[in-house]
């Protein structure tokens, strides 16, 4: 089993030194869902929310979250993000919204945390904007789907796979 990289030999938390790693193109894709009452989803899709365009605001919040990941997660490196694509897809048949985020950079470390953070922030923004009408919403299945670049190369979650070991 691989060792945890954020601890030194004394067991103290530290930021991993990526200074000697080459800069490569890196990409990560994450997804997550927010389940809600059908009436809440209809309100969002109709654009009738008094706070404004829920999905548009959530998209911008998620992009901002990707850019601020190093400020939120203590041992993350600040990364020059080159692209964020955040798509919010209403799924009326399941009474939920899917968030899928792709983040890219050219750098010495990956953007998995940025993709996961962007996804969470977008979903949290939907919750915040709609909690007055539906406090029972549930953020679910936030996970990494794919990462490309770096020493570990390409990793992709197997279809239907809920959990994965490092490969």
From Swiss-Prot:
<dbReference type="InterPro" id="IPR023045">
    <property type="entry name" value="MoaC"/>
</dbReference>
<protein>
    <recommendedName>
        <fullName>Cyclic pyranopterin monophosphate synthase</fullName>
        <ecNumber>4.6.1.17</ecNumber>
    </recommendedName>
</protein>
<feature type="binding site">
    <location>
        <begin position="113"/>
        <end position="114"/>
    </location>
    <ligand>
        <name>substrate</name>
    </ligand>
</feature>
<feature type="active site">
    <location>
        <position position="128"/>
    </location>
</feature>
<keyword id="KW-0501">Molybdenum cofactor biosynthesis</keyword>
<keyword id="KW-0456">Lyase</keyword>
<dbReference type="InterPro" id="IPR036522">
    <property type="entry name" value="MoaC_sf"/>
</dbReference>
<comment type="pathway">
    <text>Cofactor biosynthesis; molybdopterin biosynthesis.</text>
</comment>
<dbReference type="InterPro" id="IPR002820">
    <property type="entry name" value="Mopterin_CF_biosynth-C_dom"/>
</dbReference>
<comment type="function">
    <text>Catalyzes the conversion of (8S)-3',8-cyclo-7,8-dihydroguanosine 5'-triphosphate to cyclic pyranopterin monophosphate (cPMP).</text>
</comment>
<comment type="subunit">
    <text>Homohexamer; trimer of dimers.</text>
</comment>
<comment type="similarity">
    <text>Belongs to the MoaC family.</text>
</comment>
<dbReference type="GO" id="GO:0061799">
    <property type="term" value="F:cyclic pyranopterin monophosphate synthase activity"/>
</dbReference>
<dbReference type="InterPro" id="IPR050105">
    <property type="entry name" value="MoCo_biosynth_MoaA/MoaC"/>
</dbReference>
<dbReference type="InterPro" id="IPR047594">
    <property type="entry name" value="MoaC_bact/euk"/>
</dbReference>
<dbReference type="GO" id="GO:0006777">
    <property type="term" value="P:Mo-molybdopterin cofactor biosynthetic process"/>
</dbReference>
<feature type="binding site">
    <location>
        <begin position="75"/>
        <end position="77"/>
    </location>
    <ligand>
        <name>substrate</name>
    </ligand>
</feature>
<dbReference type="Pfam" id="PF01967">
    <property type="entry name" value="MoaC"/>
</dbReference>
